[in-house]
UniProtKB/Swiss-Prot annotation:
Pathway: Secondary metabolite biosynthesis; terpenoid biosynthesis. Terpene synthase that catalyzes the biosynthesis of the terpene valerianol, which is a volatile compound of floral scent. It catalyses: (2E,6E)-farnesyl diphosphate + H2O = valerianol + diphosphate. This is Valerianol synthase TPS1G. Mg(2+) 1 binds at D307, D311. A motif (DDXXD motif) lies at residues 326-330. It comes from Camellia hiemalis. Mg(2+) 2 binds at D307, D311. The lineage of its organism: Eukaryota, Viridiplantae, Streptophyta, Embryophyta, Tracheophyta. The gene is TPS1G. One of its GO terms (molecular function) is terpene synthase activity. Mg(2+) 3 binds at D452, S456, E460. The Asp-Asp-Xaa-Xaa-Asp/Glu (DDXXD/E) motif is important for the catalytic activity, presumably through binding to Mg(2+). CDD domains: Terpene_cyclase_plant_C1. Binds 3 Mg(2+) ions per subunit.
């Protein structure tokens, strides 16, 4: 947190010393300022999509198909990114398939692992004992497994659905990674299969950004000799049509952000309108959630600037004033703020008023109160961190995490995300569930907080920053930075296990809500996997271009 070394002067003439972050500027210039939707092309795509959807729907519900064929069809639909059109039909099929599933000795590793992954993704708790037949009397994997590349790849993907206490899946994860890495680029893999393996090792299905992973899979599927041309055509059309819609939405958001002109008044902050929309599109990409994407993006942008204000510019006295103003949530509180904070505070109040008006038209404004309260909670926790930095405190890891579970934004992002869902899904009970501090939301926030602490540690400490979870763990346990990183990654993996378990039936709330929390967790894996891709947007630039600019060749 930024502190004053000269003196915490809010309205005096002397400018206090500030620990400026010097964040990289926006990458995009005016690139997304204008976009004209090709209505004729969009309508053409839409008409053909409707015809193909009915053909595929008939395939999904058709009787007489073997269970293996049905699970393979569902897998292809999901990986192509078109399963959202057939949610009801797929759930009905999976319920029947799970009830009738038998561990048939004829099923190979690929098929067993595929069943395991698909069932668990949909909340069905298939036991990992189904993999026992692939181990010898010593508990080691049989030699035949090492020769089955597709089987190992399927098992590798399945291991990401593990929960606590499933040591076998930990062993399988390490085993398949080692085996697959040894095969990449070797003579035993075709170039296409080698490319699939390399991508899987870089980004798993379960933790990936659904729309990006769909685009990758489409490129693999069209080279598959056994491909279904109807499915492939639907996937390409669907991706391109949604891309047109997302691009138009991004243009509206980008222009709104430019017209708000907040960054010119707070130039110390990260300018990340495009990246926030990218984030929101991961939370929900489906066409019916356009309002939700806009709402979530705007709130994320305001939170990002607020975070940078506490983290990389504001003095302790200044941020205390801002915290108090946010708690009051009243325009009269602006009078007590320094000029640069007035612009941010005005934007905060105006955006929430705008969001409330838009959602009121659809009878969904009840969630706005919950989002405001979550925002208030976060700035209180930001102030706690500012005090720690001012006093030079390195608190215990447990105390750090208690506060970090708030600053990780899990509650705010989940609440704001729910505001964009249909009223019959995001009910008042759904928002009340968030208030109970459920494990699903807490662990989602913990993943984001811990991986960010690891990836941004060196840069933040160089400029002056409150002690992160990494620092607190190192001091408390007397370990090296590398040893602390290992332990934090163990915590991250356990958090993923908890998320997986929370999504097994019976669930606390609708799976339609839980999948949004899962998607918010996935963002951390994609954006912070190797470096802080939000602070350094060039890291995810190719993802943004792939998602919003580059169509799939038809």
């Amino acid at each position: 947190m930024a502190s004053s070394q000269v003196g915490d002067m809010v309205n005096g003439n002397a400018e206090p010393t500030r620990h400026l972050a010097k964040f990289p500027p926006s990458l995009w210039g005016d690139r997304f300022t204008s976009f004209t939707l090709d209505k004729q092309l969009s309508d053409k795509y839409g008409n053909e999509i409707e015809v193909l959807k009915e053909q595929v729907r008939s395939m999904v519900v058709a009787g007489g198909r073997k269970a293996v064929e049905q699970i393979n069809l569902i897998n292809v639909l999901e990986r192509l990114g078109v399963s959202y059109h057939f949610e009801k039909e797929i759930e009905e099929q999976l319920e029947q398939l799970f009830a009738k599933f038998e561990d048939n000795e004829d099923y190979d590793l690929f098929t067993i692992a595929l069943h395991f992954r698909i069932f668990r993704q949909h909340g069905y708790k298939m036991s990992c004992d189904v993999f026992n037949k692939f181990r010898d009397s010593n508990g080691e994997f049989k030699e035949t497994v090492s020769n089955d590349v597709q089987g190992m790849l399927s098992l590798y993907e399945a291991t990401y659905l593990k929960i606590r206490g499933e040591g076998f899946l930990d062993e399988a994860h390490a085993f398949t990674i080692a085996q697959l890495e040894s095969l990449v680029g070797g003579p035993h893999l075709s170039s296409d299969l080698s490319e699939q393996v390399m991508h899987a090792l870089k980004q798993s299905i379960h933790r990936g950004f659904p729309r990006l992973e769909a685009k990758h899979f489409i490129s693999f599927y069209e080279k598959d000799a056994s491909r279904n041309e109807t499915l492939l055509r639907l996937a390409k059309l669907d991706f391109n049509q949604l891309q047109l819609s997302h691009r138009e939405e991004l243009c509206h958001i980008f222009r709104w952000w430019k017209e708000l002109d907040l960054i010119s008044k707070v130039p110390y902050a990260r300018d990340r309108a495009v990246e926030c929309f990218f984030w929101s599109t991961c939370a929900y990409y489906e066409p019916q959630h356009s309002v939700g994407r806009a709402v979530l993006t705007k709130i994320m942008l305001l939170l990002s600037v607020t975070d940078d204000t506490y983290d990389a510019y504001g003095t302790y006295d200044e941020v205390k004033l801002y915290t108090n103003a946010v708690q009051r949530w009243d325009v009269s509180a602006m009078d007590e703020l320094p000029d640069y904070m007035k612009a941010l505070y005005r934007a905060l109040l105006n955006v929430y008023d705008e969001v409330e008006r838009d959602l009121a038209k659809q009878g969904r404004a009840y969630g706005v109160h919950h989002s405001k309260e979550a925002f208030k909670e976060i700035v209180r926790s930001y102030e706690i961190e500012a005090e720690w930095f001012k006093e030079g405190y390195v608190v215990s890891f447990e105390e750090y995490m208690k506060n970090a579970l708030v600053t990780s934004t899990g509650r705010l992002h989940t609440t704001s995300c729910f505001m964009g869902l249909e009223a019959d899904v995001a009910t008042t009970e759904a928002f009340e569930w968030i208030l109970t501090k459920p494990k699903m939301v807490a662990t989602s926030g913990a993943i984001g907080r811990l991986v960010d602490d690891v990836m941004s540690h060196d840069e933040e400490q160089e400029r002056g920053h409150v002690a992160t979870g990494l620092d607190c763990y190192m001091k408390q346990h007397g370990v090296s930075k590398q040893e602390a990183i290992v332990e934090l990654y163990k915590m991250i993996e356990n958090a993923w296990r908890d998320i997986n378990e929370e999504m097994l039936k019976p669930t606390a709330i609708s799976m339609k809500l839980l999948i949004r929390v899962l998607n918010l967790s996935r963002i951390s894996d994609v954006v912070y996997k190797y470096v802080d891709g939000y602070t350094h947007p060039e890291i995810i630039k190719d993802h943004v271009i792939s998602l919003f600019e580059d169509p799939i060749p038809m």
